[in-house]
From Swiss-Prot:
Homomer. It comes from Helicobacter pylori (strain Shi470). This is GTP cyclohydrolase 1. One of its GO terms (biological process) is tetrahydrobiopterin biosynthetic process. Keywords: GTP-binding, Hydrolase, Metal-binding, Nucleotide-binding, One-carbon metabolism, Zinc. It catalyses: GTP + H2O = 7,8-dihydroneopterin 3'-triphosphate + formate + H(+). InterPro entries: GTP-CH-I_C/QueF (IPR043133), GTP-CH-I_N (IPR043134), GTP_CycHdrlase_I (IPR001474), GTP_CycHdrlase_I_CS (IPR018234), GTP_CycHdrlase_I_dom (IPR020602).
Protein backbone atom coordinates (compact mmCIF):
# COMPACT_ATOMS: atom_id res chain seq x y z
CA UNK A 1 0.00 0.00 0.00
CA UNK A 2 2.86 2.36 0.81
CA UNK A 3 4.35 1.91 -2.67
CA UNK A 4 0.97 2.68 -4.19
CA UNK A 5 0.73 5.96 -2.31
CA UNK A 6 4.34 6.91 -2.98
CA UNK A 7 3.64 6.52 -6.70
CA UNK A 8 0.35 8.40 -6.36
CA UNK A 9 2.00 11.34 -4.57
CA UNK A 10 4.74 11.43 -7.19
CA UNK A 11 2.22 11.36 -10.06
CA UNK A 12 0.30 14.36 -8.73
CA UNK A 13 3.47 16.31 -7.92
CA UNK A 14 3.31 15.99 -4.14
CA UNK A 15 6.17 15.35 -1.71
CA UNK A 16 5.58 12.01 0.01
CA UNK A 17 7.87 13.08 2.85
CA UNK A 18 5.92 16.23 3.66
CA UNK A 19 4.86 16.24 7.32
CA UNK A 20 1.12 15.98 6.64
CA UNK A 21 1.54 13.02 4.27
CA UNK A 22 3.95 10.75 6.15
CA UNK A 23 1.23 8.71 7.86
CA UNK A 24 -1.38 9.05 5.10
CA UNK A 25 -0.83 5.58 3.58
CA UNK A 26 -1.48 3.92 6.96
CA UNK A 27 -4.50 6.12 7.69
CA UNK A 28 -6.04 5.45 4.28
CA UNK A 29 -5.43 1.72 4.59
CA UNK A 30 -7.35 1.66 7.89
CA UNK A 31 -10.08 3.83 6.42
CA UNK A 32 -10.48 1.52 3.43
CA UNK A 33 -10.78 -1.52 5.70
CA UNK A 34 -13.68 0.23 7.41
CA UNK A 35 -15.33 1.63 4.28
CA UNK A 36 -15.27 -1.69 2.43
CA UNK A 37 -15.96 -4.09 5.27
CA UNK A 38 -19.13 -5.19 3.50
CA UNK A 39 -17.07 -7.65 1.48
CA UNK A 40 -16.31 -9.59 4.67
CA UNK A 41 -19.94 -9.83 5.81
CA UNK A 42 -22.74 -12.01 4.46
CA UNK A 43 -25.99 -10.05 4.07
CA UNK A 44 -28.05 -13.24 4.06
CA UNK A 45 -26.68 -14.24 7.45
CA UNK A 46 -27.57 -10.81 8.83
CA UNK A 47 -31.21 -11.31 7.81
CA UNK A 48 -31.47 -14.99 8.71
CA UNK A 49 -30.42 -14.30 12.28
CA UNK A 50 -32.92 -11.47 12.78
CA UNK A 51 -36.36 -12.64 11.75
CA UNK A 52 -39.14 -14.28 13.68
CA UNK A 53 -42.56 -15.70 12.91
CA UNK A 54 -45.10 -12.91 12.90
CA UNK A 55 -48.80 -12.38 12.76
CA UNK A 56 -48.71 -8.98 11.06
CA UNK A 57 -50.11 -8.93 7.55
CA UNK A 58 -50.03 -5.17 7.03
CA UNK A 59 -47.31 -3.05 5.45
CA UNK A 60 -44.18 -2.35 7.47
CA UNK A 61 -41.97 0.56 6.43
CA UNK A 62 -38.43 1.43 7.50
CA UNK A 63 -37.87 4.95 6.18
CA UNK A 64 -34.84 7.18 5.63
CA UNK A 65 -32.10 4.78 6.65
CA UNK A 66 -28.94 6.76 5.98
CA UNK A 67 -26.09 5.18 4.05
CA UNK A 68 -22.93 6.02 2.23
CA UNK A 69 -21.14 4.03 -0.42
CA UNK A 70 -18.39 4.44 -2.98
CA UNK A 71 -19.01 4.76 -6.71
CA UNK A 72 -17.08 2.02 -8.46
CA UNK A 73 -16.49 4.24 -11.50
CA UNK A 74 -14.66 7.14 -9.82
CA UNK A 75 -14.03 5.91 -6.26
CA UNK A 76 -15.94 8.89 -4.88
CA UNK A 77 -18.69 8.68 -2.26
CA UNK A 78 -22.39 8.69 -2.87
CA UNK A 79 -24.70 9.05 0.08
CA UNK A 80 -28.35 9.32 0.87
CA UNK A 81 -31.13 7.30 2.39
CA UNK A 82 -33.03 4.13 1.68
CA UNK A 83 -36.61 3.29 2.53
CA UNK A 84 -37.80 -0.31 2.53
CA UNK A 85 -41.39 -1.46 2.79
CA UNK A 86 -42.70 -4.99 2.96
CA UNK A 87 -45.86 -6.96 3.56
CA UNK A 88 -45.04 -10.03 5.64
CA UNK A 89 -46.20 -13.50 4.80
CA UNK A 90 -44.88 -15.48 7.76
CA UNK A 91 -41.64 -13.75 8.77
CA UNK A 92 -41.10 -10.36 10.37
CA UNK A 93 -37.59 -8.97 10.48
CA UNK A 94 -36.01 -6.93 13.25
CA UNK A 95 -35.71 -3.34 12.09
CA UNK A 96 -31.99 -3.14 12.86
CA UNK A 97 -31.47 -6.06 10.46
CA UNK A 98 -32.78 -3.88 7.63
CA UNK A 99 -30.19 -1.24 8.51
CA UNK A 100 -27.50 -3.95 8.69
CA UNK A 101 -28.49 -5.31 5.27
CA UNK A 102 -28.18 -1.81 3.79
CA UNK A 103 -24.84 -1.26 5.51
CA UNK A 104 -23.33 -4.51 4.26
CA UNK A 105 -24.18 -3.84 0.62
CA UNK A 106 -23.31 -0.14 0.77
CA UNK A 107 -19.86 -0.87 2.26
CA UNK A 108 -18.70 -2.19 -1.10
CA UNK A 109 -17.78 -0.55 -4.39
CA UNK A 110 -21.19 0.06 -5.88
CA UNK A 111 -23.50 1.68 -8.33
CA UNK A 112 -26.80 2.87 -6.92
CA UNK A 113 -28.90 0.71 -9.21
CA UNK A 114 -27.17 -2.49 -8.10
CA UNK A 115 -27.26 -1.46 -4.44
CA UNK A 116 -31.04 -1.02 -4.60
CA UNK A 117 -31.50 -4.32 -6.42
CA UNK A 118 -29.26 -6.32 -4.08
CA UNK A 119 -31.14 -5.09 -1.02
CA UNK A 120 -34.55 -5.91 -2.51
CA UNK A 121 -33.55 -9.31 -3.88
CA UNK A 122 -31.82 -10.47 -0.70
CA UNK A 123 -34.73 -9.32 1.46
CA UNK A 124 -37.20 -11.05 -0.86
CA UNK A 125 -35.19 -14.29 -0.92
CA UNK A 126 -34.64 -14.60 2.84
CA UNK A 127 -37.81 -13.09 4.34
CA UNK A 128 -40.18 -14.25 1.56
CA UNK A 129 -42.72 -11.45 2.06
CA UNK A 130 -45.86 -10.99 -0.02
CA UNK A 131 -44.08 -7.94 -1.43
CA UNK A 132 -41.07 -5.70 -0.89
CA UNK A 133 -40.14 -2.27 -2.21
CA UNK A 134 -36.82 -0.46 -1.86
CA UNK A 135 -36.41 3.21 -2.74
CA UNK A 136 -32.95 4.76 -2.71
CA UNK A 137 -32.21 8.49 -2.97
CA UNK A 138 -28.60 9.57 -3.21
CA UNK A 139 -26.27 12.41 -3.98
CA UNK A 140 -23.20 11.39 -5.98
CA UNK A 141 -19.97 13.29 -5.41
CA UNK A 142 -18.68 12.03 -8.75
CA UNK A 143 -21.46 14.12 -10.30
CA UNK A 144 -20.85 17.08 -7.99
CA UNK A 145 -17.05 17.31 -8.04
CA UNK A 146 -16.17 16.54 -11.66
CA UNK A 147 -17.78 16.17 -15.05
CA UNK A 148 -21.09 18.05 -15.10
CA UNK A 149 -20.51 19.48 -11.58
CA UNK A 150 -24.17 19.50 -10.52
CA UNK A 151 -24.15 19.82 -6.73
CA UNK A 152 -27.89 19.52 -6.10
CA UNK A 153 -28.77 16.53 -8.26
CA UNK A 154 -30.42 13.63 -6.45
CA UNK A 155 -30.67 10.24 -8.10
CA UNK A 156 -33.61 7.99 -7.18
CA UNK A 157 -33.83 4.27 -7.83
CA UNK A 158 -36.44 1.71 -6.84
CA UNK A 159 -37.02 -2.02 -7.01
CA UNK A 160 -40.46 -3.56 -6.52
CA UNK A 161 -41.28 -7.21 -5.88
CA UNK A 162 -44.51 -9.13 -5.33
CA UNK A 163 -47.58 -7.08 -4.39
CA UNK A 164 -45.72 -3.79 -4.80
CA UNK A 165 -45.06 -4.63 -8.43
CA UNK A 166 -48.49 -6.13 -9.16
CA UNK A 167 -50.83 -3.83 -7.23
CA UNK A 168 -50.86 -0.06 -7.86
CA UNK A 169 -52.84 0.50 -4.62
CA UNK A 170 -50.10 -1.16 -2.57
CA UNK A 171 -47.48 1.02 -4.26
CA UNK A 172 -49.59 4.12 -3.65
CA UNK A 173 -50.00 3.25 0.04
CA UNK A 174 -46.22 2.95 0.42
CA UNK A 175 -45.63 6.27 -1.32
CA UNK A 176 -48.26 7.93 0.88
CA UNK A 177 -46.58 6.57 4.01
CA UNK A 178 -43.27 8.06 2.83
CA UNK A 179 -44.89 11.48 2.49
CA UNK A 180 -46.55 11.48 5.92
Amino acid sequence: MENFFNQFFENIGEDKNREGLKETPKRVQELWKFLYKGYKEDPKVALKSAYFQGVCDEMIVAQNIEFYSTCEHHLLPFLGNISLGYIPKEKIVGISAIAKLIEIYSRRLQIQERLTTQIAETFDEIIEPRGVIVVCEAKHLCMSMQGVQKQNAIIKTSVLKGLFKKDPKTRAEFMQLLKS
